[in-house]
Amino acid sequence: MSLFKAYARVLTYLKKEKNTSLLICAANVMLAIITIAEPILFGRVIDSIAEKSAIILTLTIWVCFGISHIIAYVLVARSADRLTHRHRLAVLTESFERIIAMPLSWHQQRGTSNALHILLRAIDSMSAIWLDFMRQHLSTLVALFILIPIAFNMNWRLSIVLVVLAIIYVLIARLVMRKTKDGQAAVECYHHNLFQHVSDSISNVSIVQSYNRIREETSALHNYTNDLLKAQNPVLNWWALASGLNRTASTISIVCVLLLGAFFVAKGQLRVGEVVAFVGFAQLMISRLDQMSNFINLTVSSQAKLQEFFSMEDSTFHINEPENLPCLQNVKGTVQFHHVTYKFPNSSQGVFDISFKVKTGQTVAIVGPTGAGKTTLINLLQRVYEPTFGHISIDGINIRSINRESLRKSLATVFQDAGLFNRSIHDNILIGRATATNEELYEAAKIAAAHDFILKKTDRYNTMVGERGSQLSGGEKQRLAIARAVLKNAPILILDEATSALDVETEARVKDALDCISHNRTTFIIAHRLSTVRHADLVLFLENGHLIEKGNFQELIDKGGRFYKLLKAGGLIIDQPTIKGEDKNVIPLREAIAS
C-alpha cells in the first residue's frame, strides 16, 4: 500500500464525523488565508512608517487580523482535539468488537496479544494523523497553493527562490522516504517481537519464577531492544539529516531573499515594506514546508503499522458471517453431524468424516486419548471452527445457515479452563444471563455447589476473583463456571472436562447438580470418569480425529474393541467410594468391563 493510499484510508475513518471534520477543515482554510494576509499587512505598516504616512488604519487592521488568528486557532485546535479523542475511542471500540467476534481459529492464527498490539499502535497513529489533518495538513496545502501565486504577483524573481526551496524539500523527503522504507518495516517487526516476548513472559510469570528464568527472560528482552534500536537508529539518522538539510535550505533561502531584496531596493525596483512582506512570506512558507515534512515523517513511520491494521481489519470483514441470517428459535436439542471434517491449518490434526445423531434430551460421552479431537468436535458444534466438509444440524437446521449469536444462546458450555474475568464473583456468574435476578443467580450458585464457599469470602458475591480467577482455587473457579452455565439455562449443555479440577466430595455434589440440570436436556460431555461414560446414552470413542466406535456403554464393552482396551488399560478414572458406599455410580472396574 502506497503512502498516499494509507493516508487516504486513515481519513476514511472520519466519515462518521464528516460534517464536523469538514467544518473544522474549512475554519483552518480561513486561518491559512488570514495567515497569508498578515505579512502583507505588516509590509504595508513598514512602508507607512518609512514614508511617514498614515499608519493607524493599517496597523489596526494588522493587529485585528493577528488577534482573530490567535482566537480562531485556539477554537479550531480545541474542536479538532475533542473530535480526535472522541473518534479515537469510537474506532477503538468498533475494532475491538469485531476482533473479539472473530472465530477462535482467527485468534490462533494471528495471536490475541499480537492483534491487541496492532490495534493499539494503529489507533494511536491514526489519531495523530487525524489531528494533524484537521489542524495543519489541509490548511498547509491551501496556504502553499495561495501563497505561491501571490508571491509571483508581488515579485516573480524573489518567488523563484521560494519555488526552488519547495523543490528541495520535496527531493529531500523523497530521498529519505526511499532510504527508510525497509528500515521502518523492520522497526515495526522488532516492535512486535518485543511486545510478544513481554506479553509471553508476563502471562507465564509463575513458570518464569518457578524455574528461575527472570534473568534469562530479562536478557532476552535486552536483545530484542538492542535489535530494535539497531533498526531504528538508521531511520532516525536519515530523518535527522533531512531536518538539517531542510534547515540549511531554508536559511540559505532567507539570505537569498534578503540579498536580492536589498539589491532591488537599491535599484528602486522594490520598497522596503515589500521586502519585509516577502521575508514574512518566505518564513511562512518555510514553516508550512516544515509541517509537510513532519507530516510525511509521521505517515511514513506509521505506514507499516497501519498496513498491518488494515490487513487485520479486512480479515475481520472477510471472515464475518453475512448479515440478516435467521435466528435459531425454539430449540429442542436434536443434534446431527453429517460427515464432518475439519483440519487445522498447517497441521495433520483435526477430525475426519464424523457422523452421528443425538436425540433430544440424550447425554453423549466423548471419549478418547489426548489429541483425539474431542474438544475440536465440541468447538465445531459451537462454530468456533467451521467444517471443511460436511455440516452440523440442530433440529434439522444447518448451523451455518443461522447467526452465531442465536446458536450460542442455545448452548451452555463449561470449559476445562474456567475462563473467569477479573471482576466480582457476582459479575462472573451473571455472564451466563445478564438479565437474571439475584435470586436466580444465588440459586444457580447453590446448584453448582458454589454458594457455601462464596459466603465464606470476605466480600461474598462482591469478591474480586483476580486475573483469570487467580484469587480462587481450581475447584472454586470450576464451580463458578458451572454456576454460569446453570444460570444460562440453555437447551444444549456442553461439559468439557467440567469436573476435572474438583475433589471427590465436591465432584459428587456437582455431579448431582449436573445430573439435575441435564435432565431432558441434550448434553455433551468430554469424559474421563467411568461413571460418566457408564450412564451416557451414547458413547463416542475418538482416536486420531476419527470416530472409531459409537454406541452405549454396554454395547462398546460387548464389542471388545478400542474402548474396551482403553478400560482395561486404565484409561478412565475409576470413582472411589469415599462419599457414598451405596452410590450406584461407584462400581469396581472388573464389574464395569465384565463380559
Swiss-Prot record:
Keywords per UniProt: ATP-binding, Cell inner membrane, Cell membrane, Membrane, Nucleotide-binding, Sugar transport, Translocase, Transmembrane, Transmembrane helix, Transport
Root EC class: translocase
Binding positions for ATP per the UniProt entry: 368-375
The enzyme's E.C. designation: 7.5.2.3
PROSITE patterns: ABC_TM1F, ABC_TRANSPORTER_1, ABC_TRANSPORTER_2, NDVA
Compartmental location: Cell inner membrane
MF GO annotations: ABC-type beta-glucan transporter activity; ABC-type oligopeptide transporter activity; ATP binding; ATP hydrolysis activity
SMART domains registered for this protein in UniProt: AAA
Reactions the enzyme catalyzes: [(1->2)-beta-D-glucosyl](n)(in) + ATP + H2O = [(1->2)-beta-D-glucosyl](n)(out) + ADP + phosphate + H(+)
Gene3D superfamilies found in the cross-reference section: ABC transporter type 1, transmembrane domain, P-loop containing nucleotide triphosphate hydrolases
ABC transmembrane type-1 domain ranges (all copies): 21-301
Gene Ontology cellular-component annotations: plasma membrane
Physiological role: Involved in beta-(1-->2)glucan export. Transmembrane domains (TMD) form a pore in the inner membrane and the ATP-binding domain (NBD) is responsible for energy generation.
NCBIfam families named in the record: chvA (TIGR01192), PRK13657.1 (NF010178)
Recorded domain comment: In NdvA the ATP-binding domain (NBD) and the transmembrane domain (TMD) are fused.
Family: Belongs to the ABC transporter superfamily. Beta-(1-->2)glucan exporter (TC 3.A.1.108.1) family.
Name of protein: Beta-(1-->2)glucan export ATP-binding/permease protein NdvA
Naturally occurring in which organism (per UniProt): Bartonella quintana (strain Toulouse) (Rochalimaea quintana)
Encoding gene per record: ndvA
